[in-house]
């Protein structure tokens, strides 16, 4: 099985050149006296986001250079390169030189499923989303800094491998320059170690982070602390206007036949909005072959609710996922109709637990 614990786009349910360095000399929050944010050699609190972003850029440019797509294969139990991998989309990634302008397009011809190009600048800002039927031109003036952008395109995996791969190839861009990306000189291990330091602060309860406040177009749109932790815990995550995540299914973990019955979400179907449930083993890796279900394949109860089942057979098997003891899940919602309404909806879901099927 192909596994890399810390690989491209550590996007979990967190929720979320010298010219590229943002002005990060902001007043620090009092929490830093409690959490360990001390420097790891050349990587520190002030430059970490740029170092992390540079690390992600280099994972692409070291393989294919600039202005070249890498189309990932769909996730499965035997093909998962990132912990808590996302099954409902396939990724296409690239680093593009926009120093003289570049245009990014997602066609809507022969393309009726969710698909976006997510554009990220060298400060892990901008977060521009290009949707089906749209073309967007980006120059350095549109960024918070730098001359290069990272593309993290997402194409809905509809279960038809050939069609999914066909739609990936519909993604396009044209760039007017192709200068090699100039790495910023950070040592890879220092970046990884500092990332783990910040993640450990969250996991041990030394700091609380609001992922939705860590992603924005400019520094004025983010909270300083959340911005830095978001880069560690969810680099490449989408802003809540495009996707929102439920970090766990309440009551998860037991291996008996159970049902999770929830109100159906309000998503923008015209933009291809949909939702899904993906399950994992206790170590965060996909553990079973039947680990994922799209919202449209859950059981419609006819009363405005849908049900997902776990380890159930018989007539419920087609709505059921296979799980092991101490399993966990992430629920993903794409293209919410209303951002705040969906945030409130997620809070409601946190109070709805799975129940044994009698």
Language model features: what each stretch is:
Residues 22-358:
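A compositional/structural signature for long, glycine/proline-rich flexible linkers
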Residues 1-22:
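Gram-negative bacterial Sec-dependent N-terminal signal peptides
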């Amino acid at each position: 099985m192909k596994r890399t614990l810390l690989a491209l786009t550590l996007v979990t349910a967190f929720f979320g050149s010298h010219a590229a360095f943002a002005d990060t000399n902001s007043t620090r929050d009092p929490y830093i006296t409690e959490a360990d944010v001390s420097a790891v050699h050349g990587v520190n609190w002030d430059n970490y986001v740029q170092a992390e972003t540079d690390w992600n850029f280099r994972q692409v440019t070291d393989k294919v250079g600039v202005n070249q797509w890498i189309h990932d294969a769909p996730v499965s139990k035997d093909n998962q390169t990132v912990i808590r991998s996302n099954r409902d989309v396939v990724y296409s990634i690239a680093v593009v030189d926009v120093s003289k302008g570049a245009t990014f397009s997602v066609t809507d011809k022969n393309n009726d499923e969710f698909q976006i190009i997510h554009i990220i600048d060298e400060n892990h800002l901008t977060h521009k989303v290009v949707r089906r039927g749209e073309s967007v031109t980006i120059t350095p003036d549109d960024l918070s800094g730098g001359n290069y952008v990272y593309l993290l395109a997402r194409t809905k995996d509809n279960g038809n491998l050939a069609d999914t791969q066909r739609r990936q190839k519909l993604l396009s861009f044209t760039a007017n320059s192709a200068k090699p990306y100039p790495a910023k000189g950070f040592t890879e291990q220092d970046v990884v170690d500092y990332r783990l330091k910040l993640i450990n602060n969250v996991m041990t309860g030394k700091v609380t982070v609001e992922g939705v406040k860590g992603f924005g177009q400019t520094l004025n749109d983010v909270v300083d602390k959340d911005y830095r932790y978001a880069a560690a815990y969810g680099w490449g995550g989408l802003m809540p206007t495009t996707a929102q995540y439920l970090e766990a299914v309440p009551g998860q973990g037991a291996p008996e036949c159970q049902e999770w019955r929830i109100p159906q979400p309000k998503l923008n179907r015209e933009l291809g909005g949909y939702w899904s449930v993906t399950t994992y083993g206790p170590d965060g890796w996909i553990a079973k072959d039947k680990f994922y279900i799209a919202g449209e394949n859950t059981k419609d109860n006819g009363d405005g609710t849908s049900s997902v089942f776990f380890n159930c057979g018989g007539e419920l098997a087609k709505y059921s996922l296979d799980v092991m003891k101490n399993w966990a899940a992430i629920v993903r919602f794409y293209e919410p109709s209303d951002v705040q309404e969906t945030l409130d909806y997620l809070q409601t879901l946190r109070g709805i637990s799975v129940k044994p099927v009698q």
